[in-house]
Amino acid sequence: MPRLHAPLQSATKSTSAVSTRVALEAYPGLLARELIGNTSYKSDDKAKQTPERLIARKQLLQALEMGQTRLGLRLKLSHAQHDTLVDDASGDSLDAVLCMVQAAWAQAQNEAGDEHYGLPACDPLEGWIVSAV
């Protein structure tokens, strides 16, 4: 999977060729809820970084690795990557992975011929969250 980079937006018009950059909006909580319901898996407050949240992060990663999402993708991680994600009680790294999975799904939709990256018809100013139904 190619490395993801944040697109740079410019307020000025470009005279160069048409850009191939695409900005997609992902929402990690959407995919997390699909996999573990409303179970909390993260907290910035050290006092709330509980064993229950650790278990939830493990369950979330297991579901991603087993391909249990409706997106039809499986996450492949090294042991070190898995451990790093589980150990990040803030959930920031895991949120980034959830967004990456959503972006990978959108890219797969585009490669399969969907010029809208799997997004339904929507207001171009409002946009749509990738994989939101």
Give the label of every model feature segment.
Residues 1-133:
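RNase H-like (RuvC/DEDD) metal-dependent nuclease/polynucleotide-processing core
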